[in-house]
Swiss-Prot record:
SUPFAM superfamilies: RING/U-box (SSF57850), WD40 repeat-like (SSF50978)
One function term, GO molecular function aspect: zinc ion binding
Protein name, per record: Vacuolar protein sorting-associated protein 11 homolog
Disruption phenotype: Increased numbers of germ cell corpses. Reduced number of gut granules in the adult intestine. Endosome/lysosome fusion defects in coelomocytes. Double knockout with either sorf-1 or sorf-2 results in larger endosomes and larger lysosomes and thus suppresses the endosome/lysosome fusion defects in coelomocytes in the vps-11 single mutant. RNAi-mediated knockdown results in a reduced number of gut granules in embryonic intestinal cells.
Organism in which the protein naturally occurs: Caenorhabditis elegans
Pfam families from the UniProt entry: PEP5_VPS11_N, TPR_PEP5_VPS11, VPS11_C
Region Disordered, residue ranges: 886-980
Keyword annotations of the record: Endosome, Lysosome, Membrane, Metal-binding, Protein transport, Transport, Zinc, Zinc-finger
Protein purpose: Plays a role in vesicle-mediated protein trafficking to lysosomal compartments including the endocytic membrane transport pathways. Believed to act as a core component of the putative HOPS and CORVET endosomal tethering complexes which are proposed to be involved in the rab-5-to-rab-7 endosome conversion probably implicating sand-1, and via binding SNAREs and SNARE complexes to mediate tethering and docking events during SNARE-mediated membrane fusion.
Family of the protein in this entry: Belongs to the VPS11 family.
Keyword Repressor: no
GO BP, sorted A to Z: endosome organization; intracellular protein transport; organelle fusion; regulation of vacuole fusion, non-autophagic; vacuole fusion, non-autophagic; vacuole organization; vesicle docking involved in exocytosis; vesicle tethering
Sequence ranges of Basic and acidic residues compositional bias: 886-898
Amino acid sequence: MTEFGWRRFNFFDRSVVFDKDDPKQKFMGLKDVAVDCWCSSGGSVYLGEAKGGVFQLTNQFSEYYWKAYQKSLASLHSADKYLFSIGEDDETVNTLLKIWDPERVEKNTPHVMRTIRMSPLNPTSSSPACSIAVHSSLQSVVVGYTDGTVLFYQGDVLHDKSLNSRWIKVRDSSVGEGSVTGLAIAVLPASKTVVFVITQKHVHSYVLENGRTVIAHKKHDANGATADCWTFDESTGQLIVASREMLFFYDADQCIDMDGGEVGRCLQLGRGHEKLQLVASGQYLALLTKHHSLIQKERDSEFMTMLSVYDIKGQYVGFSCSLPNLCRLFIAGSTMLVLSHDGLLSELIEKNLATKLDILVKKSMFDVAVLIAKNSRDGGDYLKGIHAKYGNYLYGKGDYENAIQQYKETIGMLEPSYVMKRYLDSSKIKELCIYLECLHDAKRDNEHQTKILMNAYAKQGEKKKLMEFVNKITDGTRVSRMRDVFEILLKWNYLAEASLLATKFQMHEDALNVIIHHMHKYTMGVTYISKMPIESVIEMTGKFGRDLLIHARDDLMHMLWEKIQENTDAKKNNFMRIFDIFMGDMDASRVFLSYIENQTNEHDEFIIPILECQMRLFKVNSDWSQERLEEDIYRFINKKNEDAALQMAQLFDCTPVIEHILMRCHKSKELMMYHQKKRDLEAIIRLCQSCSKEEKRRLWLDALSFIGKHATARDELIIIDLLKEIEASEQIHPLVVLELLAKNEHLTISSVRDYIIAWLRKQQIIIEEDRNTIKENNKAMGELDGTVESLKFNAQIMQVTKCSACDTPLQLPTVHFLCKHAYHVHCFESYNMDGSDKCPACQTTRDTTRDEEISYHKFQKELAEASNGMELIAMYLQRGLFDEKTKKTKKSEAKKDPFSTGRASTTTNPFDDDEVTTISRTMSTVSSNMATPSRQRSITRKDDDSTNPFFNSDSGTRLSTYDESKNPFGAPAPSTNPFD
């Protein structure tokens, strides 16, 4: 340790310089050189002798010598690549300022660019110049004299012609203070220049404005110094002066301040010893002090030199050693060289950074290691590792607070979890917060660490710090998920702060959750929702509406009413999305639905919820009048929603609505199934009575089938009424009715007795009518036989005068038929599309009659061969055998075209099938062959009896079973033959 407490290290190695030509021999090139002044420039150092010689020594230890002055050399200074010198060439006082270009050598001497005579510039004194300083910009130069006079010039030092004349006197002569031993120039902003003047007794500073006027002068507290005991750093503007007791530090910018600057910062380095030389090299100050020699080997070795290298910023001694005899110190490039009295040259080589740091770490001097690493160019690579070791060192000693300060500096290198595990104990939570804060400031945190920090604040009760941290997050200076922050505030019951945070970041759902569920401020919640956009109002009301409806009913309903009035576009703002909150509160539901109905006329999207509400009411109390059903339910049902309404009605078992929807959709079958499922016979009968005529038959059959399976004796009266309706409708054959009802084991004969008796009476009447019809038909057949006989054996006179097709008088050529129809030839050809010789007017009637006959015979044949005749009859009944209305309708359709040559596409006979149709198409009922159109036939020819359907093919006798009603010619017309 030094006398003032600085630590001492050995960061330099002192080694003797050997001759580069003969490495085994020591370098003795500077032996017997008496160095009186020196300066360093680039990689070279210039050593000046008092006799005028200059030695140039490079950092590769190459030598060069030239004679700068013939008589004496007083001072050397380097600026840029140039060398400036002050000296005398003759015995008289005639000081010369020479500017050298060392890179340009002529005749073994550097080129002299300019030579300025300095004595004429100070005519009031005969003292020679002894000191010089030039600014590195080569725009200003200052020269000092032995009598204390100082001259200053501002301009281009290399080229200005006025350099020979226009100098400014900065300081007058002061013989009492002695000669000027040192000069320095500092250029400051605002065109100000500070000139430091060092004499043997004092240190002065002069402030010049625009390089012409001295505006300030200060005399500092240092006692002056010799020419080798001061140093100046132009980059920082700092002057360091070494006196016997102290080292003084003066800054150029402080000299401008009128209130300070006289007293400089000082350090007691080498106190009590004579200072021989002060040299600055980088961050180090090398100081040579004179000491009494403790080991005297020679007669002139009374004194020795102590070399000390200081790091002022780090406050430690980087190197120190004693040197026998007196020595000189100078800088060549970045190397410090020591020239001993006997001409031995030594160099101080700084150890590499890793070695220095290793030394410090081993000595646990981490603070110095940190400082050295910070001041080194490559120290950043080691800095975090040093802090980590320093932190571990302090943590091991129990100094957790200072240890965390070191761990802070390891962010980016040391895994945060390593540090956090050490400080998870509750007693160290304060230090953990410090580390996590730095981690967040460095933007190397994650969400988990943010949560830990906020929870640590809350656990300590540091609400202020917690909120400051939250504010930093919300201000954007920290990055974190707002939801995590919100959840932590909510966890530690900072409800107001949590709600404000959620509000600020538009976390509306979270804000309302705090306000309603935690703070229980329901009115505030309604107010909060009312200030949101309409879409958010609907969404938030749907989520929190139930609680608000319970605790702030009036406020909520009023808010909804206002929003509905303000937003009438039902397509964009569907308020029915929040209808679920009213479930269970029928009064509120009705009020809300009234709001919705008044909102817009186009409320299709609202109908289903409205219907649901009304059906819920119906389920509670089903005693509704038809008018109320119409007003509250039926009027809302339309084609778009009838399916959804039907499903809802089935869900709530709303029978009137189900009946209404199915009836309006003409879904009588589904309605029948619904009534059957409920086993409501009365409703089934009502349905059958109210349905259309087209559906009655099917519905009666469904009803009878249901009764046959599920009816009981208690339903006898209802069944009797049902049979009356069936009897009145005449839609179902009684045999089918009896067959379906016979399947029920519970019904008695009394249920169908009246129905059977009534049917039998009707059948008796029909039988009597059929008998009368048969008699009439037999009579007609007899008349028809006479007509046929007349046609076969008597001459026929054709007396038709008009065409049966165009109803105009006949003109030859004509075509006459035995059926009393006549046609123009061209009219006949128009209607005779198939080329046959049949009467167009009678052809359709004959075909239909023949089809009926064939179908009848086919039915008789099937009935005779059937094993179960009743089953066959029932099958044909289902096909409409006795459906007279259907027969008449289809017959009338077939007769629409009296000249149709083909059969109707759909037969009216229920016994028709493909086989019958084929047979009917191959048979003809016409017994006579017609003549060709070109030949008029006036009389009939005798037909072959074998082709006559009215005679037996074997005996030729007349058939006794001939049915006159099947004669296509009808009853015979009165004879017009005058010979009959």
